Amino acid sequence: MNSTGARALIDVLLEQGVDTVFGYPGSAVLDIYDELYKCDKIRHILTCHEQAAAHAADGYARATGRTGVVIATSGPGATNLVTGIAAAYMDSSPIVAITGNVKTSLLGSDSFQEVDIAGVTMPVTKYSFIASGERGVAQDVREAFSIAQSGRKGPVLVDIPADIAAQSEEYERAPKSEPAPAKEPEKAELERAAQMMEKAKRPLIYVGGGAISSGASDALKTFAQKLHIPVACSMMGLGAYPCSAELFLGLVGMHGNPAANMAALNCDLLIAAGARFSNRVAASKESFAPKAKIIHIDIDAAEFDKNIISDAHILGDLGKTLEKLSAMLPPGENSEWLGEIAEFKRRIPRPKPYAPYTVLHTLSELTKGEANIVTDVGQNQMWTAQYYDFERPRSLITSGGLGAMGFGMGAAIGAALGKPERKTVLITGDGGFHMSLSELATLSRYNIPVVVVVMNNGVLGMVRQWQKVFYDGRFSATQPERGTDIAAVAKAFGVKGMRIKNPSQAKRVFKKALSMDKPVVIDCRIDPDCAVLPMIPPGGDITTAIYK
């Protein structure tokens, strides 16, 4: 069928089952936007900034497991996507970024709004295409979807010069792109791991974000319960195993639950399931699981021995690997080890700062751990990881690897549109809110029912906390004293504004906000001296943790 590059792009998006795209138009994507105008099967969400559009595509992907799509024009439009693309790359989230560019004949001439965006994004994408007339736009976009979902998921960029979008292209409908099949785990690797597990007296499962992106949660639950092995999660792994489960120990790492960290310190076998041993969890082998043999299961061989040297590696799909290992082993008991962990919990209870704990525990109870919980970055993020009880996978959407402030608002828009049947709540700080508050206009325009909870302490809390602990209280540039009336700002955008002046008001305010089928912003006041605790100092371990 005779078509154009722009029309072929839209047709391939329809092939892939895309129903929502996020973006911002410009001169280099006029042909693409003209075809979008003619298409009534794809909803376009116009954000106020391209970075928010990229975060929205990412939030959509994380909430649904499907590939998110973002479109931007050339030059500054494309470069504004980079932070969002990098956030998706660091957390293995599948998005396809479509950018326009100047005509092919002008590439390399420093033309108006020309940027080599394929080159710029090469370090933070799985692959970057520059569409050409020889291959055709359709083939590039199909491959982009396949690459984004294959193996370790991640972002792919397709840069389409304006003349390629406008020129004639033959289009033939094709089936939806399928990800490449994951490698089957090697029998010898499985047998070695099974032998190590049979000998272990104090095993611990350390779960990362790979358990969620691979859909391995059910296999993980079956594996842990059959073998009676306790489970600790990185922040990205939260939700992969229910917080209410008996074997769940909580968050592990710098701000982790003391019981989870003590279990890591004392275990004799650590099974890393889809985890990358981030320095926020494992600063070194000497400080993290120093007594343990380590089995590392991952779909990406590049993760093996990158941060922590392991004793056994299993390359392959996590769910299939856990199923095969479970079938090779008899049921476990580990009663003595679980008794030790119970003693850890009794001896070192986790800190519960009144305001953050009360606010987030109340929210967790009201939503029963089932909401789409999106966070920004900083203290708000860590308090959420500590005190909200996640009961299902894909319920926490946060910028873990990149730690991008301003991530939350865009990601919440994407999550709410991707999973409208679940309530979406954004937990942000006043710093992240100020970075992205223009997207209140997007919430208002499309009536996207996100509850935005601003943990408002009037400071850049996490950096200020470090300055207090490690820099003798020299608060350099972390006390902006903006004095913004956040509820009034929300009202100016046509969004309902509410306030929590005291944590005792949280239940009443949350009940009202959650009952509304429209966006709401809640200004929740927090003492600026309220810290994220415990806190393991850089280079330290659980024995050097700060508790007050």
Task: Outline where the language-model segments fall.
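Conserved structured core elements
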Residues: 26, 214, 316-319, 353, ...
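Short acidic loop-to-helix transition motifs that present clustered carboxylates
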Residues: 29, 50-55, 380-382, 502-506
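N-terminal alpha/beta PP-like core and its mobile active-site loop of ThDP/TPP-dependent enzymes
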Residues: 1-328, 366-369, 449-452, 470-472, ...
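Phosphate/pyrophosphate-binding active-site segments
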Residues: 171-173, 191-195, 291-377, 503-507, ...
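Short, internal active-site loops enriched in acidic
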Residues: 162-165, 380, 528
